[in-house]
A protein has these predicted regions:
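Hydrophobic/aromatic beta-strand patches that form the interior of the parallel beta-sheet core
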Residues: 99, 147, 173-175, 356-360
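Acidic/His- and Gly-rich active-site-bordering loop/insert found
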Residues: 2-145
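Non-cysteine beta-strand/loop elements that form the S-adenosyl-L-methionine
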Residues: 100-102, 203-208, 359-364
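Histidine/acidic-residue-rich, glycine-tolerant segments that coordinate divalent metal ions
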Residues: 86-91, 106-114, 118-119, 135-263, ...
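Alpha-helical scaffold segments that flank or form the walls of functional sites
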Residues: 126-136, 161-167, 389-391, 396
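Local beta-strand N-terminus motif with an aromatic residue
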Residues: 97, 170-172, 334
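Divalent metal-coordination and catalytic microenvironments
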Residues: 49, 90, 101, 117, ...
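Metal-dependent amide/peptide-bond hydrolase catalytic core
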Residues: 3-7, 16-17, 23, 225-423
Length: 423
């Protein structure tokens, strides 16, 4: 009799866990079957965006392609969302908590999708439709939303969406995944969960001088190219005194037309990165001081324009750990975190300061030594193998979202991690 009572007590104690495990398995099956069934359509969307690269805030084709696809699957897509022409939004479910999937799709000048944003869009679309099917299968309250986030490449699209109210207080999590060359992920892992990035600043500099004949009467000119070259040189010397994790990169976008005319106008662009926003701001001031000094020395005037600042990406431990565990169920061994933060910057960092956020990494095959922001990486981002990795990452994110919506304890842990990081 005692043994029977013990067994009955054991059954009572384990049944909630067994029920939860069964729900998770049901959700995984629903996500996998739904996403796999529409894979050829996802591939068409992915290939279409990849073959039509568009710069920030000009993503007309990508915007229409994704919105059309969502509507073809029975979702209502709100185009031109939050006052941005190339943003969109669609939602599934009702009541409960809310999880957002962020879809990027802008490209780079000259090299197309050298950052693989077509794959980011594909992963988030797969995550959204997969999570929507899981909500139906489980019959639980909760909402998932896909948000088109244009202009990550310097345009600060997510920052504008934050200001417009897209990431409100009722958002339990915002999720996305980014592609990375496989050789940059150590130990042959399939990706990185707790991915960290630097705060970044972008500066535009214009120098104004005076034209003159460079051979006949150079003393009558004020050389704007001298100011730009001097700025570049002094910043290069400044790099000796910056911290190892800090980055300063610059280019001369316009430096004159012909050598026999002293340039009266030149233009530069700079990127500044550091661990924190305060460090990035301080380093930016030092770069600006180089420009001001160069302008004064050459007799030019300078105009400095500051782009929307990107904040450092805050990691959410609960979201990252959940993603790692869910990728195991997809036979993907994902690294929890790398030893050092990436030197990249993203406007998802700004989102991570507003709501709990996840910015995972999935590895894609490339030629040896190929980095991001490279034409060869753009080629790799258009392969079937890269598409497959994006879709698998999407399935993982779909399960993370489902678990947040289904499990109040996990949702509380996610919120706790966010508040702890927010200080």
């Amino acid at each position: 009799m005692t043994a029977i009572l013990v067994q009955q007590q054991h059954n009572v104690e384990t049944s909630p866990k067994r029920k939860a495990d069964e729900s998770l398995q049901m959700a995984r099956r629903a996500i996998a079957s739904t996403v796999d069934a529409m894979d050829k359509h996802l591939l068409a969307v992915n290939n279409g965006i990849h073959s039509h690269p568009e710069l920030c805030y000009q993503e007309v084709f990508a915007h229409a392609t994704i919105a059309d696809f969502l509507e073809s699957q029975g979702f209502k897509a709100q185009r031109h969302a939050y006052g941005l022409d190339t943003s969109f939004e669609a939602e599934a479910g009702s009541g409960g908590r809310l999880v957002i999937f962020c879809a990027e799709y802008d490209a780079l000048p000259d090299i197309g999708h050298g950052c693989g944003h077509n794959l980011i869009a594909t992963a988030s679309i797969a995550a959204f439709v997969g999570a929507a099917s899981a909500l139906l299968a489980l019959g639980i309250a909760g909402r998932v939303r896909i948000l088109g986030t244009p202009a990550e490449e310097g345009g600060g699209g997510k920052v504008k969406l934050i200001d417009a109210g897209a990431f409100s207080d009722d958002v339990s999590a915002a999720l996305m995944c980014h592609a990375m060359p496989a050789h940059q992920v150590k130990d042959g892992k399939a990706g990185i969960a707790a991915f960290r990035t630097l705060a970044s600043r972008r500066l535009g500099m214009e120098f104004f001088g005076k034209n003159a004949h460079a051979g006949q009467e150079p003393w009558s000119g004020i050389n704007a190219l001298d100011a730009a070259v001097s700025t570049y040189t002094t910043v290069s010397m400044l790099r000796q005194q910056i911290k190892p994790h800090q980055r300063v990169q610059g280019v001369i976008e316009e430096g004159g037309k012909v050598p026999n005319i002293i340039p009266d106008y030149t233009r530069m662009a700079w990127g500044v990165r550091s661990f924190s926003s305060s460090e990035a701001d301080a380093l930016s001031e030092r770069v600006e001081a180089c420009a001001n000094g160069a302008a004064k020395a050459s007799g030019c005037t300078v105009k400095i324009t500051r782009a929307i600042p990107y904040k450092e990406l805050r990691v959410n431990e609960a979201l990252s750990a959940t993603y790692v565990s869910e990728m195991v169920s997809l036979a993907k061994d994902v690294l929890y975190e790398d030893d050092e933060p990436s030197s990249a910057g993203t406007d998802m960092g700004n989102v991570s300061h507003v709501v709990p956020s996840f910015h995972g990494i999935f590895a894609i095959p490339t030629l040896p030594g190929v980095p991001c922001h490279n034409r060869a990486f753009a080629d790799a981002a258009g392969t079937p193998e890269a598409h497959r990795e994006a879709v698998e990452a999407g399935k993982g994110m779909a399960m993370v979202a489902t678990r947040i919506l289904e499990d109040a304890d996990l949702a509380a842990k996610v919120k706790y991690d966010f508040r702890r990081r927010s200080g």
